[in-house]
Amino acid sequence: MSASASRDLKTGGCLQGRVKVPGDKSISHRSLLFGAIAEGTTTIEGLLPAEDPISTAACLRAMGVGITPIEAGKIVTVEGVGLDGLQEPQHILDCGNSGTTMRLMLGLLAGRAGRHFVLDGDASLRRRPMRRVGQPLASMGADVRGRDNGNLAPLAVQGTTLRGTIVGTPVASAQVKSAILLAALTADGPTTVIEPSQSRDHSERMLRAFGANLEVGGEMGRHISVKPGATLHGQTVVVPGDISSAAFWLVAGALVPGSDLTIENVGLNPTRTGILEVLDQMGANIEIVHPRDVAGEPVGDLRVKHGPLKPFQFGEEIMPRLVDEVPILSVAACFCDGESRISGASELRVKETDRLAVMARQLKAMGAEIEEHEDGMTIRGGRPLRGTALDSETDHRVAMSMAIAALMASGPSTLARSEAAAVSYPTFWDDLARLHS
């Protein structure tokens, strides 16, 4: 199939079997970054072999870090250059479509005194806000410049000596927090990050494992302090399956009559399990099988069976723990009798696309009744959806969400730009074909 051809989406049938989702995207990025600035070799098992982590690896290679090719099923090794070993690159660092790469690179590079870096990306990334990282870094003495007063790429980073300080983040964002923690490793004194509410904590867990002098305190773990000077040492990292990718199968298994799915080896970090809480609120039949701890992260297998679902509501307080799952939950809401309400989700308007607008547009094309709000949407479920021509609008999470919606529609659908799924889940279409009967 050509890259831009429309894909025929299946309807009807049920989903049965076992599936392993790709490695967690957040943990994949961080294992590459922390391995790069550690002493010695880091080996990474289960790294997500998709476009975004590949962008992170390419940027690190351009600064002298040895990283083996990222291929499905292969262990990746990173030859660390130490905390101050990153070289000034000869070219612009291309972050592709990856907001995580760009935001974490800003923190990584801000304290490289005397070295100059330019970060750029694709058309979508050039529209995404970066001041939320640049501003807190500036309070540490960072010099980050770009379009729209430093908010939009391309961004130039002139490495400076950073000062340790107390930094309040404007939003509960793991990307913002992680950028500051990376910068804090090279500052001239201790740095404390204070979040408005706790975001995913993969960076804190992994930095500690690599040997950083990092403490978590305050209410709900919202105060994270780093003392510079510790040497990071290469580690063996095992990347669990990404719960944000598992979410598509959790919702599909709950929605599609006759379904019984087991999703293996899923990361169950409590800062990421909002999706399980909302599905529980809906009455979904989900069981955690064989919960275990792997390389400092809680992991388990998730079994989901079809059953009736109730409408839901959730808002700002849970949003940091399920921000990437809002698109697929908006699909689930269409099949619950009654009104579901999502609020506190304005962050979705500055993702790869305006995800609230795109999901509302695509689901309305199928006949859904949706009212969009500035920070969310109200969905009146229970109306039958009809198959139609759909478009991912280049967003990976939209592509996979619409594939699940199409399973429940009357009549066939097509999806334009279905290749977007590869950003986080390169084997999604193969897995869907295998599980669908």
Swiss-Prot record:
Pfam (any one): EPSP_synthase
PROSITE patterns: EPSP_SYNTHASE_1, EPSP_SYNTHASE_2
Catalytic activity: 3-phosphoshikimate + phosphoenolpyruvate = 5-O-(1-carboxyvinyl)-3-phosphoshikimate + phosphate
Pathway: Metabolic intermediate biosynthesis; chorismate biosynthesis; chorismate from D-erythrose 4-phosphate and phosphoenolpyruvate: step 6/7
Residues the record lists as binding phosphoenolpyruvate: K25, G99, R128, Q175, R355, R397
Enzyme Commission code: 2.5.1.19
Function description: Catalyzes the transfer of the enolpyruvyl moiety of phosphoenolpyruvate (PEP) to the 5-hydroxyl of shikimate-3-phosphate (S3P) to produce enolpyruvyl shikimate-3-phosphate and inorganic phosphate.
Family affiliation: Belongs to the EPSP synthase family.
Name assigned to this protein: 3-phosphoshikimate 1-carboxyvinyltransferase
Annotated organism of origin: Synechococcus sp. (strain CC9902)
Lineage, uppermost ranks: Bacteria, Bacillati, Cyanobacteriota, Cyanophyceae, Synechococcales
